Design a protein with these regions (language model features):
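N-terminal signal peptide c-region/cleavage motif recognized by signal peptidases
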Residues: 18-20
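N-terminal secretory/targeting leader peptides
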Residues: 4, 10-13, 24-115, 123-126, ...
Length: 331
């Protein structure tokens, strides 16, 4: 009888230990719009690998690339509800939550990668991410898409005036709609997973994205003209569900934050090293590449200044803070 009781207690203890271990194991979903092989997807995979390494495999992150979990707006709602744990998306899209994130969509804000890194990794970028907590979002780190360029199926763009009349897909927010209108083109807000079909079916003439996105999504199959305009730099936000974050212990939070910081640096390096190669690949794929002359580039900046002034008025404090930080960097 005594031996049976001991066996029963040992078995119960084993089950309890197993239950605790199982309870500590977690699997998170990581959604992003870019396909497998894109630098952002590579950054997401690196994050998953780092999280697994830092938690001894106890936390697993499954990456769902190519928009298979839905568009950005739906994904943000799911993240706030805790049904998707991790996202990587254009920081400007978060203007739907905190209007000040619109500043990341202003044309010609950053002169280069060095400035962008200093801003997003410094107090300015961290302060904006911290404000997301009130919206059920934890901002972990910034990655990048890079500088955006315009493609279309109708004509080469050699001058700013060539952009007029084109029906261009834009990220669904007000500033992107307005800068396209300022150039005399017709903006069409559209979720990213719909863009290829929209181009293929001629519902839109063109779109604008960094070279890596144009290549990875095979837009060259349905777009023959590429204008290297570098009109807008796109930081990306690596964000986490606060609803889930609040259930985690300090050690797990630290592992996730450290993994995000390391994956961010890795992703940017990969993206930048691929940029020149991407342009060559697009040329080989048959795209006709044009660049605006310095005079036309200046004309483009001038046409977009009223858009920046209009949208900057609503977030004047944030714009002034960013411009002050940029002024320090440019001394």
């Amino acid at each position: 009888m005594k031996r049976l009781m001991i066996k029963t207690l040992v078995a119960a203890a084993a089950l309890a230990i197993a239950g605790v271990a199982a309870a500590q194991e977690k699997t998170f979903k990581f959604g992003l719009q870019n396909p497998k092989g894109h630098p952002l997807e590579m950054g997401a995979v690196k994050f998953a690998e780092l999280v697994a390494a830092k938690t001894g495999g106890r936390i697993k992150v499954n990456v769902f690339a190519g928009g298979v979990l839905g568009g950005d707006a739906a994904n943000v709602s799911a993240l706030q509800g805790g049904t998707i744990e991790v996202l990587m998306l254009n920081s400007g899209i978060l203007a739907s939550q905190i209007k000040d994130f619109e500043v990341y969509d202003f044309p010609f804000m950053f002169a280069g990668a060095r400035e962008a890194d200093a801003i997003v990794d410094g107090p300015f970028g961290q302060k904006l991410h911290a404000r997301l907590a009130d919206k059920g979002i934890v901002g972990l780190a910034y990655t990048e898409l890079g500088f955006r360029n315009i493609t279309n199926s109708r004509k080469p763009i050699n001058t700013v005036d060539d952009i007029a009349g084109l029906k261009l897909r834009v990220i669904p927010n007000a500033i992107n709609v307005d800068w396209v209108k300022a150039l005399g083109a017709n903006p069409t807000p559209m979720a990213f997973p719909e863009v290829y079909a929209g181009l293929e079916q001629k519902a839109i003439d063109g779109q604008e994205n960094p070279l890596s996105v144009i290549l990875a999504n095979k837009f060259y199959e349905v777009q023959k003209n590429l204008a290297v305009t570098n009109h807008q730099y796109n930081p990306q936000s690596l964000i986490f569900s606060k609803k889930v974050w609040d259930t985690l212990g300090d050690a797990d939070r630290k592992a996730l934050q450290d993994a995000a910081n390391e994956a961010s640096k890795y992703q940017r390096q990969v993206n930048r090293s691929k940029s020149a190669d991407d342009l060559d690949e697009l040329k080989k794929a048959g795209m006709q590449v044009t660049e605006l002359s310095p005079a036309e580039q200046a004309k483009l900046r001038d046409k977009l200044k009223p858009v920046i002034e209009k949208h900057g008025a609503a977030i004047a404090g944030t714009v002034a803070e960013l411009q002050a930080e940029l002024a320090k960097l440019r001394k």
